[in-house]
From Swiss-Prot:
Function (record text): Catalyzes the phosphorylation of N-acetylmannosamine (ManNAc) to ManNAc-6-P.
Top-level taxonomic group: Bacteria
Record note on quaternary structure: Homodimer.
Positions of transmembrane segments: none
Organism: Yersinia pestis (strain Pestoides F)
GO terms of biological process kind: N-acetylneuraminate catabolic process
Family: Belongs to the ROK (NagC/XylR) family. NanK subfamily.
Protein name: N-acetylmannosamine kinase
The keyword Heme is annotated on this UniProt entry: no
MF GO annotations: ATP binding; N-acylmannosamine kinase activity; zinc ion binding
Pathway: Amino-sugar metabolism; N-acetylneuraminate degradation; D-fructose 6-phosphate from N-acetylneuraminate: step 2/5
Keyword terms: ATP-binding, Carbohydrate metabolism, Kinase, Metal-binding, Nucleotide-binding, Transferase, Zinc
Amino acid sequence: MGKGLALDIGGTKIAVAVVTESGMLIGRQQIATPRGGAGQLAAALETLIAPYRHQVDFIAVASTGIISGGRLTALNPANLGGLADFPLYDCIRSISDLPCVLLNDGQAAAWAEYQALGDKNDNMMFVTVSTGVGGGIILNKKLLVGQRGLAGHIGHTLSDPHGVLCGCGRRGCVESVASGTAIGAETLGWKQPVSAATVFDMAQQGDAQAGKVINRSAAAIAQMLADMKMALDLEVVILGGSVGLAVGYLERVVAAQKTLPGIYRVPVQEAHHRQDSGLLGAALWARTSL
């Protein structure tokens, strides 16, 4: 199978690139994720896909949310501008008749990062901390997708039963504590609320209040990793996403892990493919599926 067109639909951006047979990304570009509903998302996808219809052999899509039966649904619709249900496969097929494979973005990233590890680990997990919190799981060298595409939605495991209400409708999910959205929300009580990116900039400059907010996020991730270690006997965790890859975040997660008994700790490292794990993983997965 020749070149593929990979797309990564996230809460803030949609990235696209041609992926060669050797796994090289060519012509990568991205746009902001539309916030205006299904019509705008469909138009954005056509803008990104149409120029490549006669240049590639297949289309591979990694997307935030639940991918099942060709549809994209969201546990937390706020992560997609309120979009709760979208006929993703049919939309893409209306743009191009090329073979198309869909996968959750955390699952796709996990597959790419698992390949990058080589044949070293049977059980690993990818964690993305970004607009939301998600992930993908490899068990016994196989990607766990699930009957309904739900596997890896670790951001909706419990962090604080008395915490804020998550966009999924449950109270105290990890996502509602640790995500970039949650970090930004923590500043609403400040004299001047700021974005998650600004919180990280402030922490880098030694701002104690900003550091405390980031530490709370990192601690929630560390506790979630402890739970996943005990449930899945993980050998390694790969950290990605805009927050997960922010300067100093990995070190804060590791520091939070060190407060736990040794059995609950798991090695954590940054994503080898950085922000492109989802793009590459979708293409790699498509090659095994088509």
